[in-house]
Structure formats: C-alpha cells, structure tokens
C-alpha cells in the first residue's frame, strides 16, 4: 500500500487526466463559442497546458485523455432527461446543434494531441 506522498506521487502510480481539451469547448467556432460562452481563459491556459503535458511525458507519467463523443441529432446519445434539462436551464442550446459528434472537427483535440501509446477514453 502506498502510504507516503513521495510513494503516491511516483510516476508509476500517477496519471495526468486531460478532460475535454476539444475544439467544442476551447476553439473559436466550437460549440461553446457558438453558444456565446466566454472562452477568454482558454488561450492563456494553453501554453501552461503544453508545458504540463511535456513535463508529464518527460517524467514518464501516464497521460489519460478524455474525449467526449455525443451529438443531439436524431441518433443522439444524450438522454431525453438531459436534453430537457438543457432546454430549461440553457435555453435549449444543446438541442440546436450537434456537439462532439464522433469524427467531426468539434470532437477533435484543441492544440494538443495524444501520442499513440497514450490512453484515450471516449
């Protein structure tokens, strides 16, 4: 059992989890931008994220990439309950256009890219 901080922080027992660094959520023209969300914090964050990824790879820390895959088209993966909540809380923004459709630009990673041996969770 890992009991000390140095043991727990050892690269063999550590992972950097990158969640939703996707065009949909970070890029001009992505779903959040089209919805009118403020993306002003994304650009200042990206150089830091690049450095963090580079340092994690250099330290042999496992990188795990989370990549959403869903849409709101006729074959959507979102539950009816979720869509109803989106309509009530966000004026239906998610029901007006697809978000993170598999294989589309919106679902692609934004200014970062997993290496072939890194884990992608979709």
Per-segment meaning from a language model:
Residues 1-115:
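Active-site acidic carboxylates
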Residues 114-115, 119-122:
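Glycine-rich oxoanion-binding loops at beta->alpha junctions
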